[in-house]
Design a protein with these regions (language model features):
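Well-ordered alpha-helical segments within folded domains of soluble proteins
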Residues: 3-19, 82-91, 138-139
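Well-ordered alpha-helical scaffold segments within catalytic/enzyme domains
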Residues: 10-23, 40, 143-146
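Carbohydrate-binding surfaces of carbohydrate-active enzymes
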Residues: 19-28, 161, 188
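C-terminal beta-rich recognition modules with glycine/proline-rich loops and embedded aromatic residues
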Residues: 29-37, 42-150, 179-181, 190-193, ...
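Beta-strand-rich binding/interaction modules
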Residues: 151-171
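Short strand-turn-strand beta-turns centered on an Asx-Gly dipeptide
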Residues: 170-173, 227
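Surface-exposed loop/edge segments in extracytoplasmic proteins
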Residues: 174-178
Length: 257
């Protein structure tokens, strides 16, 4: 696959704008998936080397020269991807929340703080604590709420990711009853006060995702996904000198974290 880093970033920006237009969590799902798996793959852990393309699979030597190297490199002749990657990582914080005159939408999970003003409610402050994307437990604490004379109810919307089949919600330790479907938002509407605490726990099942059979090169291939993270098998991870083409994954193994 081609998977240019800048094209993945464009996918993030496009779906972010669709989410702003329609408030549909499916667009935030795409933003999250692309950020974690298609944008971050474009830069090395030390931040010094970059991919122009992000190949899904690298095969043995070919009888012709590829335009782009198989490994990340410090210099790319078409130098759009490195600065675009850095810009996107730096501005990802702007995708975490969206607001309306009387609601806050939590689109991306991760440890952060929010300070904003709702047109119909007033100043709002939130602190989010979580080990996401490794764990599905998220804690949100209200650090600023409208003054007593101006208190009005407003809604906090929590994204239910497309991979989440079960979630639990508590407010100030009390369970909130409800069934939340994947690809939606869970809404909590109340008069909030400083110190209120929301505990949102999403199950993170391990899933096997099969490639589209209409794409010949990836037919009968799967990836392992847990939460928002998509995993792949790399040659350096294989012990005993076995070739990657000879490796199989039993479906029962996918359920073993």
């Amino acid at each position: 696959a081609y998977c240019e880093t800048c094209a993945n970033i464009a996918n993030v920006m496009f779906n972010q704008r669709l989410n702003l237009l329609y408030g549909d969590s499916k667009y935030a799902d795409i933003v999250e998936t692309a950020l974690y798996n298609s944008v971050l793959s474009g830069v090395s852990l030390d931040g010094k080397k970059y991919f122009y393309t992000n190949p899904l699979r690298i095969s043995a030597d070919l009888p012709y020269t590829l335009r782009w190297p198989k490994e990340r490199t410090e210099y790319i002749s078409c130098f759009c991807c490195p600065p675009n990657t850095l810009r996107t990582v730096c501005q990802a914080q702007n995708y975490a929340y969206t607001v309306t005159p009387n609601a806050v939408y939590c689109n991306l999970y991760g440890a952060n703080t929010l300070a904003t003003t709702l047109k119909e409610t007033g100043k709002i402050g939130l602190v989010q604590e979580t080990e996401y994307p490794w764990e599905g437990a998220v804690k949100l604490t209200v650090t600023e709420a409208p003054k007593p004379s101006k208190k009005k109810a407003f809604s906090l919307f929590l994204r239910v990711p497309d991979w989440c089949e079960k979630a639990t919600l508590k407010v100030n330790g009390e369970p909130v009853q409800g069934t939340w479907k994947a690809n939606t938002y869970a809404e909590v509407n109340r008069i909030w006060k400083k110190g209120d605490c929301v505990e949102w726990v999403m199950d993170m099942p391990v899933k096997l995702l099969e490639a589209n059979p209409l794409a010949e090169e990836i037919r009968n291939q799967v990836v392992v996904k847990r939460g928002p993270l998509v995993y792949c098998l790399e040659s350096m991870d294989i012990e005993g000198g076995h070739k990657i083409d000879n490796c199989l994954l039993y479906t029962s193994d996918a359920a073993d974290d």
